[in-house]
């Protein structure tokens, strides 16, 4: 698995999963626009953790999050520990002749934090930790607040546990502003943006080379330009070029270019259009004012085009 443009984060995570002491990056909040590779980074981190002997679970911020976190943790930890919680109880009692029956049955279900503590204790006995990743965070989900609050206590208890959460920038901001999880403001903040063109080019070349296939230099350059630094677009371009190439080791230029076109249309439909539809009328006016410039836009210029003051444009941007 090739992960382009995120070397520093990947290296720090890898060190953290193998370190005897706790590192800040084990509690991280990842933010970025659609298509910047948030989910891919979470997936890569999970693979890293498993290689280092951790148990990892993938979660989505939806109702039922707490129980899903526990059930998935038990399931993924099954190869490390036995999570069956059973106790003995008297099931029958007879008088003359006296008889007592003993059976095994499930105990009364304790609270979520208690069950998670038992799980973490048993993992610790085996030298293993637990990584929870939560994608598409929904800041107004009560269970997310409960989970992060309990996680803070796990950290204070010096348990071997990690939490990586990812979401769109405005959702991340709303979560961090929640007073009940203020400790997250001290978490590692990872902001994902575009990847440099040379990183994209190297990743494409390495991917095809490792698989014994080739694409011409000219088409690689076209692909890099079409990708524009977006990790998800890189996935789409690579996949479609590969598929259009059929079984040929040397992918013909025409087929590779068709793959680039298909990826571009898919990116517009899956990423750009939903992002645009979420914008407010003023958001769209702001963007239209920016589009008049070929390079970076000055806030003073945008304010003039919108008929607003410089201070308004500054506040709106922030």
For each predicted feature, which ranges?
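C-terminal leucine-rich, beta-strand-based interaction scaffolds used for sensing/assembly
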Residues: 218, 265-318
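Conserved catalytic segments around the Walker B and adjacent sensor/switch elements
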Residues: 46-64
């Amino acid at each position: 698995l090739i992960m382009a443009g995120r070397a520093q984060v990947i290296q720090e995570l890898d060190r953290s999963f193998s370190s005897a002491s706790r590192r800040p990056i084990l509690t991280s909040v990842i933010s970025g626009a659609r298509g910047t590779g948030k989910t891919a980074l979470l997936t890569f981190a999970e693979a890293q953790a498993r290689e280092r002997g951790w148990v990892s679970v993938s979660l989505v911020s939806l109702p039922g999050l707490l129980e899903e976190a526990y059930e998935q943790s038990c399931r993924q930890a099954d190869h490390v520990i036995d999570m069956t919680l059973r106790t003995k109880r008297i099931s029958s009692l007879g008088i003359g002749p006296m008889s007592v029956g003993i059976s095994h049955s499930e105990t009364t279900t304790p609270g979520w934090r208690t069950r998670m503590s038992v799980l973490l204790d048993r993992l610790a006995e085996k030298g293993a930790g637990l990584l929870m990743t939560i994608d598409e965070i929904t800041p107004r989900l009560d269970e997310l607040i409960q989970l992060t609050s309990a996680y803070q206590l796990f950290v204070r208890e010096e348990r071997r546990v990690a939490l990586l959460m990812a979401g769109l920038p405005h959702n991340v901001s709303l979560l961090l502003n929640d007073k009940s999880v203020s400790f997250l403001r001290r978490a590692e903040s990872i902001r994902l943006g575009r990847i440099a063109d040379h990183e994209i080019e190297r990743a494409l070349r390495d991917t095809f080379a490792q698989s014994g296939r080739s694409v011409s230099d000219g088409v690689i350059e076209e692909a890099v330009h079409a990708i524009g630094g977006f990790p998800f677009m890189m996935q789409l371009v690579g996949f479609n070029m590969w598929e259009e190439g059929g079984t040929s080791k040397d992918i013909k230029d025409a087929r590779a270019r068709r793959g680039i076109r298909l990826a571009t249309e898919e990116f517009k439909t899956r990423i750009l259009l939903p992002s645009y539809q979420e914008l407010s009328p003023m958001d769209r006016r702001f963007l239209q004012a920016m589009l008049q410039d070929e390079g970076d836009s000055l806030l003073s210029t945008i304010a003039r085009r919108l008929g607003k003051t410089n201070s308004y444009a500054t506040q709106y941007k922030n």
